[in-house]
């Protein structure tokens, strides 16, 4: 039998039309390599970036590298029992953590599991750890203050609700102490707090939790922990988990504060993961997307408008704005703020509080350098009375540091210069503050008023601290009504100024210094 070309062509067309394409998505793969917490999987055709992959023994990994013939994933926890040939499955979901009021007062790990021995957590649902930050239209400008309780910060570097304010400095100079005191100061303010500890010793974290409990702030705080001994993947993801827990309050029209302690260690953990995944290294061996690592996290801190809250809660909450304020911490090496990660985070945040080793060693606690510390948006949120009284404080300190350096070379100083130096010395001494002793708005106002109006001129430098303590004790006992008014309203007018002046005049007359 012979077929001509036309018949052959028709037959081929007919077969093509009848052919059915049968495709089967594969969601099961095989581990082909295990090393240093990284697994390489073959056979996963249906997997997305950041997806949770189910491993044997009820464990999970996260897919980070999607390559032509394999998937690189990082294991969330111990990996010693995993071996080549083990079967794994895709789950179709990304990592989620529990959120809600039930987490307040608890210590949890990166996955939101309790590690404080207080039993299971009653949560209000789950939230993905990776969430797109609110857009420009959904945001509201920062105009409400977050009081840290530190005179040096609240007067010169004010922080607003929804702001990102970096705390930067060398190791062991009070970065965590400043952040913890800020959390302690929120116990009666209604601001919910989240403290994220990344890459720290378990004993250090236990001490922080104990201090928060002692000062009555733990009931208002969620502590998220990824210790130095835990997998790099958990250290890398801990800030995102804590952020999702803080966003729960923001999206329901409440105010929240989150401390990331610290993002340097998170960047190191991410660098470790990236190098093990054989991603190309860049400056200081960090991967190319280390800026995005921090920017997508810190952009989630914001103040959102009432429409956003109403839309998110489906009309349950109306007319209320919400905020998430971030205090990221960065550790520098020998004061080098021009290193890769510090410059990245400085450019992302709305200002920085720079702590200096020399100031710390000279006895100034908190060791804030007012010259290079700045708050780019907090000024609009500053309490009126603090804003009015602190105007000359920053100038006095800046002039003092400049003149102090100059006076070392000058043998003879005129009276005006000497007066400026003496005033600067007294203001510097007044800015000293003990740890775990945050001050109220009224207490800060009285101290700043005394400095601004010249009440410290006749006080010996060594007695400034005692003078301040006695003055505040006098004001809170003899003029409690005035102090309550200042705390409640935060306003400053001629009446309040007159009362403060009369009170301080009376104190100076009755006391000998």
UniProtKB/Swiss-Prot annotation:
Places the protein is found: Cell inner membrane
One Pfam family cited in the UniProt record for this chain: ATP-synt_ab
Family: Belongs to the ATPase alpha/beta chains family.
Binding site for ATP: 169-176
This protein's GO CC annotations: plasma membrane; proton-transporting ATP synthase complex
Name used for this protein in its record: ATP synthase subunit alpha
EC number of this enzyme: 7.1.2.2
Organism: Shewanella sediminis (strain HAW-EB3)
Positions in coiled-coil regions: none
Membrane topology: Peripheral membrane protein
Primary role: Produces ATP from ADP in the presence of a proton gradient across the membrane. The alpha chain is a regulatory subunit.
An MF annotation (GO) of this entry: ADP binding
UniProt catalytic activity: ATP + H2O + 4 H(+)(in) = ADP + phosphate + 5 H(+)(out)
Enzyme superclass (EC): translocase
Subunit structure: F-type ATPases have 2 components, CF(1) - the catalytic core - and CF(0) - the membrane proton channel. CF(1) has five subunits: alpha(3), beta(3), gamma(1), delta(1), epsilon(1). CF(0) has three main subunits: a(1), b(2) and c(9-12). The alpha and beta chains form an alternating ring which encloses part of the gamma chain. CF(1) is attached to CF(0) by a central stalk formed by the gamma and epsilon chains, while a peripheral stalk is formed by the delta and b chains.
